[in-house]
Structures are given as structure tokens and as C-alpha cells.
């Protein structure tokens, strides 16, 4: 009889724990009645990683497995392109940036390409074999000028179209999982394990390390429109700097929804809304600085992790936005 009661107690305990855990990970938000996103299919198994336009209509998307596609209608449709690269190299094209007709591509392993005719032709540039890390981010700074950051936190600049590169930091930051550059020329990076982050302000030549704000490992960091930082951490935590100019001062953690998936990116749309994207089609927005959130109905239907949100607001009348997913999934901002 005692064994019977013991087994019954264990069953009840397991059921109670299961119910409690399910309550922790299935919270839901209201679903928005409409979506400003239009789904596009790139018809590829590759993951799109970055997008840039040379003008209002003409642009490129790049990604894994040598993915490069071209659009001539503002990103409504895309056609496959190819680059003159070794057939046996499976390049990961991770960053692209245009300023008018001049464009740059950074890829892994050890790839930087340059175009001066809006991407009709691309030339591969030679890089030093001892370059710390692999190219991670390329930024167009004007005619023949660009800045290259590696996944080890090394920063290089060229002023002659990529013929020569000059280091701008005295030593690399170490292996990073995420690295971003602000419009003002500042950098922020997340260590490979997510246990700290580093900043490099314009004019500095040494990275400054900062402790994470909680026990949760940092997933990604970036810049708000006002130049302050935002942080996404494991456990679906979102934080914003709450003191101007103080990168170590963070507001209370926002956890809009706990569905078992981490957020991977955060971005501000042209109307001031804040968007968070993450695993299993997670795409949510807030219109009141995080006080309340809604699930986007279009993102919720995507059979993909949503890994990056990009907005280009340089032209107020023709603002562009994209959410990049996996296996060719792409959402286009239609406002």
C-alpha cells in the first residue's frame, strides 16, 4: 500500500512540475491585426545574411554557400548572380555595403571584394595571410575608402580602393560572436561565449571590456537610433541603456514573451517602432518603448529562425526594411 501511495505521489508531483514548467514557457502576446511585412521566397537553401542597395531600386543580398542575388525593383524580386571565385571554396558572404556605384563584400574565409560599377563586376582583393580572424563587417566610407572588421575584433581601413590596409587598433579584441558599427564610427562586440562585451569609440585604438549586466549570457548588442546601446541576452531578455553616454548603465530587463526561443536581433523601424526577431519565426514589436508588445502575424507563419532585421532610413520617402531568415526566407517591409 505504501508503494502505491508513493507511486501516486510521484505521478502527481511530475504532473505538477510539468504544468508549472509549461506555464513558464508558453506565455502569449496579442497578435497584431495586420502586418507591415511581405514574405518573399528566394528559392534557395542558403541563409541570407546582409543586404545593401546602390540606389532606390538596385541592390544585392548575400549569404551562406556563396549566395548573391540582385534586385532591380527595390527588393520586391531577386535573381541569382554569381561571383568569379574558386569552385571548391564554400564562401560565406557575410557583409555587403554600397555607397552609390561603389560596393564592398566581406566573406569567409579571407574574402574581400570591390566593385566600382554598382556590382556589375567584382574584383577580389588580396589580404595578408596573418590577418587576425576572418572578415566579418565591411563599411563603405566614400570613394576608395572602407573599413573592415574581423571576427577577432581587428579593424583595418583602406583609402586606395583596397590595395593597402592599415590597422586602426593596437590589438584585436579576441573571438567575437557579434560585432556592430554605429553611424558615428563606434564599434561594439560580444565575446564568443557571451560572458562580456567590448566597445571601441571613434579615435580609440584599444577595446574596452565591460561585464554583462546579469547572469544571462549576451546574445547580441547594437545601437539605438540615439547612439545608445541595446542588448539581447539569453532567456529572451531585452535591455536598453538608461543613462546617456554610460554603456554600463542598463534599464530593467524586458521579457515580452517566453516561448523557449532566444531573440537574435533588435531594430527600430522608420515610424519609431521597435522590433525583436528570434527563433522559430519569433517577430514582435512595441510602439510604446517596451511597455506593451504584439506578435507580428506574418513572422509567426515563417518556418524559420529570424536572424536579422535591417532598416535603411537614409531616404525618408523610400525607407527599406528586411527580416532575414534561414533557407531563403525573407520578409520585406511594406509599411
UniProtKB/Swiss-Prot annotation:
A lipid is attached at residue 24 (S-diacylglycerol cysteine). This is Photosystem II assembly lipoprotein Ycf48. Keywords: Lipoprotein, Membrane, Palmitate, Photosynthesis, Photosystem II, Signal, Thylakoid. It holds the Pfam family PSII_BNR. Residues 1-23 form the signal peptide. The keyword Thylakoid applies. It is found in: Cellular thylakoid membrane. PROSITE patterns: PROKAR_LIPOPROTEIN. Part of early PSII assembly complexes which includes D1 (psbA) and PsbI; not found in mature PSII. Binds to the lumenal side of PSII complexes. Interacts with YidC. It is a lipid-anchor. Belongs to the Ycf48 family. A 7-bladed beta-propeller torus, about 55 by 55 Angstroms, with a depth of about 25 Angstroms and a central pore.
